[in-house]
């Protein structure tokens, strides 16, 4: 096993670009959007626009730090540098926790999607199989991960664009009845209780699911340590975020809700598949099921990659067991991949014990972890700016826009989301679990890391360049 050699820079601009595209298209869109639609109705489009604006500010804050100092471990390392070791410890492990929880949601969605074709097969069997498959692939060279993400992302993007064009074609050419008795068109956005049928309360409630949908997009910052030219490719990837949000979330859900009455969109599978199946277009439903399965596989792949690299960075800083920093001959932190695979077996157990309730529970907990990570990223960027002179700020190659008002508004929005989780009964458990997790991390740091602080822990350095 390699220990002296660092992570390999095996991710090209093409890999990073499509990872940026693919990270916006996952379980939160293909499955979780059904719950968000039921909460807010067509007004969910506003929730995605507002949440997307806040997420873009998070990504720009992360991009400023990642371009300034591209390292393995990314924002966990930045938090240690600018907010202190405890903050880095809490942020790094909360991100790893987020990836575990999100991955459990993703493997659960994979099992649900497979039920479209094989309803008689127990879901936990599919979950177990995909955990072993993706875990094995992540033990390969990082280029294998990059290539897999490239092709899966290409498939997802192509399918979304094709679905949007097909939906617009159905509306434009008067394909208003497909044997279902339902009208097709923009009238569906207003005919079933209005554009905001559940009021402002429904719109606010949907933020818990909407923010979960954006979770994982920060993986672009984690890839900085393995990107061949981070100062060029990361800004391009991050600046494409607003367009991706408009295309993949707002326009996509707009078309879906125009095609089919939103009150009849259920949660027994992907709403994308349901709508085309109910419209009588069975072949399109089958193709879309392949796409959503691919999206779930891609998301699981990214989850394992992101958590593994964060734990590797934590180990370099002395915030995780030293074994997590061991590399295979392919330059992969193999121990962290094994740990992630073992953690995902919890998902297998949950799908065996409570198959009907597992997704909502996991998604709400993931929302807490996701928003906590974003809040810490924003606070870290503010702390970095405060530590810099005017000359240093002027030399930043990718500065955050609308400083300081943009980051301040994004910070306030993240705090607001915590309030949403605590206010609505369905998500209160997530806030409780999240608070317990943070308290556990604080206690763990004080008992484990702080006594060793004077022993001189290794510091994360930029990954070595291997072309």
Curated annotation (Swiss-Prot):
The alphabetized UniProt keywords are:
Amino-acid transport, Cell inner membrane, Cell membrane, Membrane, Symport, Transmembrane, Transmembrane helix, Transport
Q: Could you tell me where this protein is found in the cell? A: Cell inner membrane
InterPro entries annotated for this entry?
AA-permease/SLC12A_dom, Amino_acid_permease_CS
How the protein sits in the membrane? Multi-pass membrane protein
Provide a Gene Ontology MF annotation, just one: symporter activity
Q: Main localization of the protein?
A: membrane
- According to the UniProt entry, where is the signal peptide? none
Q: What does this protein do?
A: Major high-affinity histidine transporter. Binds and catalyzes the uptake of histidine into the cell. Functions as an histidine:proton symporter with high specificity for histidine.
This chain belongs to which protein, by name? L-histidine transporter HutT
Q: Which organism is it from?
A: Pseudomonas putida (strain ATCC 47054 / DSM 6125 / CFBP 8728 / NCIMB 11950 / KT2440)
Q: Which gene encodes it?
A: hutT
